A protein has these predicted regions:
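Polyanion-binding surface elements
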Residues: 1-19
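Intrinsically disordered, charged low-complexity linkers and terminal tails
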Residues: 2-3, 23-26, 61
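Short, structured motif recognition centered on aromatic/hydrophobic residues
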Residues: 4, 38-44
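Ca2+-coordinating acidic residues in Ca2+-binding motifs
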Residues: 8, 45, 242
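Major-groove DNA-recognition helix of helix-turn-helix-type DNA-binding domains
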Residues: 14-40
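A short, Lys/Arg-enriched interface patch at domain edges and termini
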Residues: 43-62
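Phosphate-binding site recognition
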Residues: 61-322
């Protein structure tokens, strides 16, 4: 039988050598044996499902040193193939083990929030392209089939409000509705989907043609998720990146109440008691008071910079920059 050392297994599986030896000692790796004080492991052994992956270890060994860092890059497919990407895909595993209905991640600027949300979009979204190729060499893929089964399973609604920094509510509203219209257009198959009713198709046409009325936009997440659910026979994942940017801008420029009112209606329709919602993700810098914007959203789980859960997936750990 061809054997490999603990160090070789560490490189292959993306975990520390110490973790490999601990797993061997605990009998977690079938066929592992100690010879002359060193662990020998079958070369065809699979990484145990409970092995903790040292995020970034895979890329440090596998990625050429000359690749640039993905500074300012928020496109996961681009960052993970053309740049020196630190593997954060175990965030998906941690989420799937708990499956909260709606998760809010609050982190400072430049902590990789948008890149992580795009990673979630690429992983979960059902598309014509086989997007599994962006994960087969990542830590999440080594965790087993029960996690792989979620890849490419859901229709996804993705909105990022990170650039909505306008001086008036009128300009902000126009920017927000344009982003919503662009996301509707991304799902162009819905325009003539036989699974959707005429009322939904009429709303779809008003939003993509603009201008629709404010009621259409406030209920746009609920409408789009319902249409996607019917079209794909599968509930939708909703991802809202930098949800609080328009609200912060409203506070600075004097239209806070208008921004909060619109966002409250938008989120309530899409994330509260929505039968067409599989699960939702939001990111932001601040947690705006629940009473002002997340009123009645009892299924919201907040993960802040002070929480240990998910803390290794935003920014970099000491090991990752060592």
């Amino acid at each position: 039988m061809v054997m490999m050392s603990a160090k070789e297994a560490s490189t292959l599986w993306g975990i520390s050598t110490r973790r490999v030896t601990t797993l061997c000692s605990a009998g977690k790796i079938p066929g592992a044996s100690k010879e002359n004080g060193s662990w020998q492991i079958p070369a065809n052994a699979e990484k145990p499902a409970d092995a903790r992956v040292r995020t970034g270890a895979y890329k440090k060994s596998a990625m050429p040193a000359h690749l640039p860092l993905p500074v300012g890059i928020s496109d996961y497919r681009l960052a993970s193939t053309e740049y020196y990407y630190v593997d954060k895909t175990l965030m998906i595993k941690d989420f799937l083990e708990q499956r909260p209905m709606v998760s809010l991640f609050t982190r400072p600027r430049r902590f990789g929030k948008t890149l992580n949300m795009d990673m979630l979009r690429v992983f979960f979204e059902k598309t014509e392209e086989d997007t599994s190729k962006y994960f087969t060499n990542k830590a999440i893929w080594a965790c087993g089939q029960k996690y792989r089964d979620y890849q490419g399973k859901y229709p996804v609604i993705f909105l990022t409000f990170k650039d909505v920094k306008r001086n008036t509510w009128e300009e902000t509203y126009a920017h927000l509705t344009r982003l919503i219209g662009e996301e509707y257009l991304r799902h162009a198959d819905l325009a003539d989907s036989p699974a959707c009713n005429d009322f939904e198709k009429a709303v779809y046409q008003r939003i993509v043609s603009s201008p629709a009325d404010s009621t259409d936009y406030i209920s746009s997440l609920k409408t789009l998720s319902s249409m996607l659910h019917k079209h794909y026979n599968c509930p939708a994942v909703i991802i809202i990146d930098e949800y609080d940017t328009p609200i912060q801008q409203g506070h600075l420029m004097g239209f806070y109440d208008d921004a909060v009112s619109f966002m409250r209606g938008l989120f309530s329709g899409g994330l509260k008691d929505n039968r067409s919602l599989a699960f939702g993700f939001l990111t932001g810098i601040l947690r705006v008071a629940k009473e002002s914007i997340f009123s009645g959203l009892n299924n919201l789980v907040v993960n802040s910079v002070l929480d240990k859960k998910y803390n290794t997936y935003f920014g970099f750990t000491a090991d990752e920059v060592a």
